[in-house]
Design a protein with these regions (language model features):
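Enzymes that bind and transform nitrogen-containing heteroaromatic metabolites
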Residues: 1-159
Protein backbone atom coordinates (compact mmCIF):
# COMPACT_ATOMS: atom_id res chain seq x y z
CA UNK A 1 0.00 0.00 0.00
CA UNK A 2 1.30 3.45 -0.93
CA UNK A 3 1.25 5.67 2.16
CA UNK A 4 -0.82 8.85 1.85
CA UNK A 5 -0.53 12.13 3.72
CA UNK A 6 -4.05 12.97 4.87
CA UNK A 7 -5.14 16.24 6.45
CA UNK A 8 -8.14 15.52 8.70
CA UNK A 9 -9.49 18.71 10.22
CA UNK A 10 -12.65 20.68 11.01
CA UNK A 11 -13.38 24.28 10.09
CA UNK A 12 -16.21 26.77 10.10
CA UNK A 13 -18.17 27.51 6.92
CA UNK A 14 -15.98 30.59 6.44
CA UNK A 15 -12.78 28.56 6.74
CA UNK A 16 -11.58 29.06 10.32
CA UNK A 17 -10.19 26.18 12.39
CA UNK A 18 -10.32 28.26 15.58
CA UNK A 19 -11.94 31.48 16.68
CA UNK A 20 -10.13 34.40 18.31
CA UNK A 21 -7.69 33.35 21.07
CA UNK A 22 -7.64 29.78 19.67
CA UNK A 23 -11.25 29.25 20.81
CA UNK A 24 -12.52 25.83 19.70
CA UNK A 25 -15.98 26.06 21.27
CA UNK A 26 -17.64 26.30 17.82
CA UNK A 27 -16.87 22.58 17.40
CA UNK A 28 -19.46 21.76 20.08
CA UNK A 29 -22.24 22.75 17.65
CA UNK A 30 -22.12 19.26 16.14
CA UNK A 31 -21.21 17.22 19.23
CA UNK A 32 -23.52 14.31 19.89
CA UNK A 33 -22.90 11.67 22.52
CA UNK A 34 -21.54 8.50 20.94
CA UNK A 35 -20.91 10.14 17.53
CA UNK A 36 -17.35 10.52 16.31
CA UNK A 37 -18.12 11.31 12.65
CA UNK A 38 -15.79 8.60 11.34
CA UNK A 39 -12.74 9.50 13.42
CA UNK A 40 -12.34 6.02 14.98
CA UNK A 41 -12.43 4.36 11.55
CA UNK A 42 -10.03 6.95 10.14
CA UNK A 43 -7.50 6.57 12.95
CA UNK A 44 -7.37 2.78 12.39
CA UNK A 45 -5.82 3.42 8.95
CA UNK A 46 -2.93 5.60 10.14
CA UNK A 47 0.16 4.84 12.18
CA UNK A 48 1.97 8.16 11.93
CA UNK A 49 0.92 11.71 12.76
CA UNK A 50 2.48 15.07 11.92
CA UNK A 51 1.61 18.23 13.86
CA UNK A 52 3.06 21.63 14.53
CA UNK A 53 4.33 22.50 17.99
CA UNK A 54 1.46 24.91 18.73
CA UNK A 55 -1.09 22.19 17.94
CA UNK A 56 0.85 19.71 20.07
CA UNK A 57 0.94 22.17 23.00
CA UNK A 58 -2.80 22.89 22.64
CA UNK A 59 -3.74 19.20 22.68
CA UNK A 60 -1.41 18.58 25.63
CA UNK A 61 -3.11 21.42 27.55
CA UNK A 62 -6.48 19.72 26.99
CA UNK A 63 -5.28 16.62 28.84
CA UNK A 64 -6.01 14.25 25.95
CA UNK A 65 -4.02 11.09 25.28
CA UNK A 66 -1.76 12.19 22.46
CA UNK A 67 -0.75 10.56 20.29
CA UNK A 68 -3.39 7.84 20.37
CA UNK A 69 -2.02 4.44 21.44
CA UNK A 70 0.20 2.77 18.86
CA UNK A 71 0.73 5.91 16.76
CA UNK A 72 4.04 7.71 16.16
CA UNK A 73 3.81 11.50 16.42
CA UNK A 74 6.22 13.90 14.73
CA UNK A 75 6.06 17.40 16.20
CA UNK A 76 7.46 19.97 13.77
CA UNK A 77 9.36 22.55 15.79
CA UNK A 78 12.04 25.19 15.41
CA UNK A 79 13.35 24.36 18.91
CA UNK A 80 14.52 20.74 19.04
CA UNK A 81 13.64 18.79 22.18
CA UNK A 82 14.49 15.25 23.26
CA UNK A 83 12.15 12.60 21.88
CA UNK A 84 9.74 11.05 24.36
CA UNK A 85 8.24 7.61 23.73
CA UNK A 86 6.04 7.82 20.64
CA UNK A 87 6.71 11.56 20.25
CA UNK A 88 9.57 12.75 18.04
CA UNK A 89 10.44 16.44 17.87
CA UNK A 90 11.58 17.24 14.34
CA UNK A 91 13.28 20.44 13.21
CA UNK A 92 14.39 19.43 9.71
CA UNK A 93 12.70 20.07 6.39
CA UNK A 94 9.07 18.99 6.11
CA UNK A 95 9.51 17.66 2.55
CA UNK A 96 12.42 15.47 3.66
CA UNK A 97 10.38 14.07 6.56
CA UNK A 98 7.40 13.23 4.35
CA UNK A 99 9.65 11.66 1.72
CA UNK A 100 11.33 9.55 4.42
CA UNK A 101 8.00 8.45 5.93
CA UNK A 102 6.48 7.60 2.54
CA UNK A 103 9.53 5.48 1.66
CA UNK A 104 9.07 3.36 4.78
CA UNK A 105 6.48 0.61 5.13
CA UNK A 106 3.45 1.57 7.14
CA UNK A 107 -0.06 2.89 7.15
CA UNK A 108 -1.21 6.36 6.16
CA UNK A 109 0.18 9.59 7.65
CA UNK A 110 -2.23 11.96 9.40
CA UNK A 111 -1.56 15.69 9.51
CA UNK A 112 -3.52 17.09 12.47
CA UNK A 113 -2.51 20.73 11.90
CA UNK A 114 -1.84 23.42 12.58
CA UNK A 115 -2.35 25.75 9.71
CA UNK A 116 1.36 26.44 9.19
CA UNK A 117 2.06 22.74 8.67
CA UNK A 118 -1.04 22.18 6.51
CA UNK A 119 -0.17 25.15 4.30
CA UNK A 120 3.49 24.10 3.99
CA UNK A 121 2.40 20.61 2.93
CA UNK A 122 -0.02 22.09 0.38
CA UNK A 123 2.63 24.45 -1.02
CA UNK A 124 4.95 21.46 -1.42
CA UNK A 125 2.14 19.44 -3.07
CA UNK A 126 2.53 16.73 -0.43
CA UNK A 127 -1.11 16.33 0.64
CA UNK A 128 -2.81 13.30 -0.89
CA UNK A 129 -6.22 13.78 0.75
CA UNK A 130 -8.05 16.56 2.56
CA UNK A 131 -10.82 15.43 4.90
CA UNK A 132 -12.51 18.60 6.09
CA UNK A 133 -15.54 18.55 8.38
CA UNK A 134 -17.39 21.81 7.83
CA UNK A 135 -19.09 23.05 10.99
CA UNK A 136 -22.27 25.06 10.23
CA UNK A 137 -21.02 28.23 11.88
CA UNK A 138 -19.61 31.53 10.62
CA UNK A 139 -16.79 32.71 12.88
CA UNK A 140 -15.72 35.84 11.01
CA UNK A 141 -12.24 35.85 12.53
CA UNK A 142 -9.68 33.59 14.12
CA UNK A 143 -7.24 31.14 12.57
CA UNK A 144 -7.89 30.53 8.87
CA UNK A 145 -7.27 27.05 7.52
CA UNK A 146 -5.89 28.15 4.17
CA UNK A 147 -3.35 30.94 3.88
CA UNK A 148 -2.61 33.06 0.84
CA UNK A 149 -0.04 32.07 -1.73
CA UNK A 150 -1.12 28.47 -2.19
CA UNK A 151 -0.67 27.13 -5.71
CA UNK A 152 -3.74 26.22 -7.74
CA UNK A 153 -4.53 22.56 -7.07
CA UNK A 154 -7.38 20.69 -8.69
CA UNK A 155 -9.25 18.65 -6.11
CA UNK A 156 -11.80 15.88 -6.51
CA UNK A 157 -14.83 15.93 -4.22
CA UNK A 158 -15.34 12.42 -2.88
CA UNK A 159 -18.33 13.05 -0.59
Amino acid sequence: MQRKVIVYIACSVDGYIAGPDDDLSFLSVVEQEGEDYGYAAFIQNIDTMIVGRKTYDKVQSMGLEYPPPGKMLYVITRSPKPDSGHVKFYSGGLAALVQKLKSEPGMHIYCDGGVEIVNQLLKLNLVDELIISVIPTLLGSGTQLFGSGLPVQKLTLVS
